[in-house]
Amino acid sequence: MTEIKTQVREIADVQRVRLRSQYANELFIDQSEDESLTIEATPRVLERIETTVDGGLLSIDLAGGIGDRIRDALTTSLTRPHVVIRLSLRQLRGLDIAALAYIRVRRFETDTLDLLFNGPGEIEFDHLQADTLSVTNSGPGMIRLAGQVSQQDVSLRGPGEFAARDMLSKQTRISVNGIGNATIWAEEQLDVTISGIGGVLYMGSPVVRSKISPMGSLARLGDR
């Protein structure tokens, strides 16, 4: 059996998180006054994971030379190392993910949040409370949100999905440039632009302004 070890890394004053990795990653984030970071992986994998904090940005990257990079590129679903990251933060204003990752964020309150996702996997918030939310999903992954925000700006640039039927938003602007799909709950204003063959489903009775390509679709699901 492969040995798994848990390593504690020192962090302080983190507000944004950036993850770059060829591994299979699980990242669990919760809100706490006591900041902490633990990583679970094999000893060899732990040696390659670099964590730095600079200007409030926590970067999680892979170290290694050209040989390591080649081996990373040749990994498959059967050989790809697995990493579990547990993170407790006082504040979260940015999440930038370019990796195969499953990310679970429990209840979190913040003034503003920027989500950037480019990779397979899923980002899920159990309950998000924010004034403003900006989302860019450029890959095939799923972003699933519940909670409440005042304003949100969503951009789907690939085949990914945005599932937010359980997150109330007063003002929503969404653009779909590929084959992505979104489900949202809008209360006051909804601006939709679809230039690909994707679709948007919405709940609620907002004032709707739309610009839809012939292959795109916009439909109302009804009230909550």
What do these predicted ranges mean?
Residues 1-224:
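Intrinsically disordered, low-complexity terminal regions
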